């Protein structure tokens, strides 16, 4: 019996870490996770610079989880 080193393709993770950026123009951002199957996130979240809830949009994918 011969054993060989076989490299299998790594499966993609179900969730990804994304960077959310404030649309108020303050430059405030935070990271959150979302499902890989969902469309890009858009949500209301508290921005401490303007001290209000403002719209945050997904800027980029950071990594897979």
From Swiss-Prot:
Residues 1-8 form a transit peptide. Coiled coil: none annotated. GO terms for biological process: translation. Keywords: Mitochondrion, Ribonucleoprotein, Ribosomal protein, Transit peptide. The keyword DNA-binding does not apply. GO terms for molecular function: structural constituent of ribosome. Component of the mitochondrial ribosome large subunit (39S) which comprises a 16S rRNA and about 50 distinct proteins. Belongs to the bacterial ribosomal protein bL33 family. This is Large ribosomal subunit protein bL33m.
């Amino acid at each position: 019996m011969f054993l060989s080193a076989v490299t299998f393709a790594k499966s993609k993770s179900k969730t990804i870490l994304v960077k959310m950026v404030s649309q108020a123009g303050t430059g405030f951002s935070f990271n959150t996770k979302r499902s890989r199957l969902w469309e890009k996130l858009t949500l209301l979240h508290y921005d401490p610079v303007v001290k209000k809830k403002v719209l945050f949009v997904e800027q980029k994918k950071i990594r897979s989880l």
